[in-house]
Amino acid sequence: MISFSSFYQQIADSNLQHWLETLPSILGKWQRDHKHGNLPKWEKVLNKLHYPAPDQVDFIDSVTVGSGEQLSPGEKEKLENLLRLFMPWRKGPFHIHGIHIDTEWRSDWKWDRVKQHISPLKNRTVLDVGCGSGYHMWRMLGSGAKRVVGIDPSPLFLCQFEAVKRLAGTHHPVHLLPLGIEELPPLDAFDTVFSMGVLYHRRSPIDHLLQLRDQLRTGGELVLETLVIDGDENAVLVPQDRYGKMNNVWFIPSVAALMLWLKKCDFTDIRCVDTDVTALAEQRRTDWMPNESLVEYLDPNDITKTVEGYPAPKRATIIAVKNQPNQDLIS
């Protein structure tokens, strides 16, 4: 069974220690709720990942574990077969002992767009909301973060993350907890909070922004990346049914509307640092994710539109700072 005890020990004497009042019981319930289904099968695969400590790691320019020279061809083939049992791999890529996990998303491209605009992560405590399998968490660690905590309720993402961590070394201060943000108390503790690719999946985007704010210390930085549309501060797309074949997209605001929402939620120093139309090469079908991908979500006759006729995915990155608490918002 995946254990979170090392995380509990690490935060026991930190500014996250009050989280221990509720976290163990919440995660214990999550484990009991997932005693059946795929999790036990994936945990058996994790228990087979017994390999020597890697001769090198790189989290600065990529997520690379091992040079590729440590394992024999047979050992490498066995490892690849084990890692393929965690398919589909959506966020990456990862380079593990010479094995290239070519994920659906080129998450490194997103990181390259974001990293130049954020405050330096050196010695920061970081929260990554909706972290997927943890690719960006490793890059945050490579940027000097003191501790990185990711939350994502998916059992598969947790097991993919655990696979990489067990191969990279469990001593690294990066942790994935299978939680949604609504399960977090107001921690007011993180120096930087990332929410990338989450906001449009939330039924109440304002509540999501307030939940993000509640995790930051005063003066902490929010890095928000989400789908946007063109338009003024009153422009918000509410898909009638599906958007890009996704049935869980609720609100897609314009950049101006999103910045207004952040201001209303008592953020300050709000700025849009990047907008980017998602390229077909950034999200695509691969050998490690053989299902439908972006090209199938777009109109085959006009890739500037989704199959439903909405504007094709365009993403913006907004950076904002948590202001002093506003008692009107708290109440």
Swiss-Prot record:
One of its GO terms (molecular function) is transferase activity, transferring alkyl or aryl (other than methyl) groups. Keywords: Transferase, tRNA processing. HAMAP family: tRNA_carboxymethyltr_CmoB. Transmembrane segments: none annotated. It comes from the Bacteria. Homotetramer. GO terms for biological process: tRNA wobble uridine modification. Disulfide bonds: none annotated. Its EC number is 2.5.1.-. The gene is cmoB. Belongs to the class I-like SAM-binding methyltransferase superfamily. CmoB family. This is tRNA U34 carboxymethyltransferase. Carboxy-S-adenosyl-L-methionine binds at K91, W105, K110, G130, D152, P153, S154, I181, E182, M196, Y200, R315. Catalyzes carboxymethyl transfer from carboxy-S-adenosyl-L-methionine (Cx-SAM) to 5-hydroxyuridine (ho5U) to form 5-carboxymethoxyuridine (cmo5U) at position 34 in tRNAs. It is an enzyme of class 2 (transferase). It catalyses: carboxy-S-adenosyl-L-methionine + 5-hydroxyuridine(34) in tRNA = 5-carboxymethoxyuridine(34) in tRNA + S-adenosyl-L-homocysteine + H(+).
